[in-house]
Design a protein with these regions (language model features):
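PP2C/PPM-type serine/threonine phosphatase catalytic domain
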Residues: 1-268
Length: 268
């Protein structure tokens, strides 16, 4: 398969209920068509519905599906981070309002997303799910948990989807290299497993699908008491640097207001 000059990835996702009564995690990736990948990139996201709240699974699944649907509806002239923030702020307002209803009382969810566009990855994050980068055998945690610092209160989220009407997403931008591995985990995976263990398992470099399954299996075998979800993205090939520069220039173009009656446009 020829992939030179194109964005190409391999993806693997595994999610297990574990000992919980139901699975409130949800993760998915949308690779799109070759044209979509060239213009807007690809999207992957993981969300973990807050346990004990009604509608936790629904909040998580709708967060991911809303991102995927809404991101590609934004068009390719807006930057990836701005597009994700626009979509998720609208979703957060809806979820916060629904959280006041009986059907979805206090529904909240963590949310961690990766947009790979050109030769760069954009990570948007709120909550305590995590994004990681494996490069040259070294695993780096990209995101920071939005939880209380006291060891006995680290399960308490300070920021999440639906928790407040105003959403604040952390944004990290990373220059990618071919053969990088990006990883998303719920706390049911990185809770029982140390970063060193995660790095060893991910560094075996089997298929993305096999390694996602191995991470979840190891977390549950280590005594994990939560839902466990892992999403692995292997960067197989990247477009040329010139493509990245053009995409960046387009994203920085100002969005002008629509013309009004009587305005002159290009001399007409």
């Amino acid at each position: 398969m020829l992939t030179n000059g194109r964005l190409w990835v391999s993806v693997g996702v595994t999610s297990e209920q574990g000992p919980r009564a139901d699975n409130q995690d949800f993760a998915a990736a949308y690779l799109g068509s070759e044209t979509q990948r060239a213009r807007q990139g690809l999207v992957a996201a993981l969300a973990d519905g807050v346990s004990g709240a009604k509608g936790g699974r629904m909040a998580a699944e709708l967060a991911v599906s809303s991102l995927i649907d809404g991101y590609y509806a934004q068009g390719d002239t807006i930057g990836p981070a701005a597009a994700v923030e626009r979509v998720m702020r609208a979703y957060n307002r809806w979820l916060a309002a629904m959280g006041r209803s009986e059907a979805m009382a206090h529904a909240c969810s963590t949310f961690t997303a990766i947009v790979v566009r050109g030769r760069r990855a954009h990570v948007l994050h709120v909550g305590d799910s995590r994004a990681w980068l494996l490069r040259d055998g070294h695993l780096t945690q990209i995101t920071a948990d939005h939880t209380r610092s006291h060891p006995d209160q680290r399960h308490i989220l300070l920021r999440a989807l639906g928790l407040e009407e105003q959403l604040r997403l952390d944004h990290h931008e990373i220059a990618l290299a071919e053969h990088d591995r990006l990883l998303l985990t719920s706390d049911g995976v990185h809770g029982p497993l140390s970063a060193r263990r995660l790095g060893r398992l991910l560094g075996r470099r089997q298929s993305a699908e096999a390694d996602a399954a191995a991470l979840v299996e190891a977390a549950l075998a280590a005594g994990g008491q939560d839902n466990a979800t892992a999403l692995v993205l292997d960067i197989v090939s990247l477009p040329s640097a010139s493509h990245d520069a053009i995409a960046g220039d387009m994203a920085r173009l100002p969005i002008l207001p629509p013309p009004q009656v009587g305005d002159s446009v290009d001399g007409f």
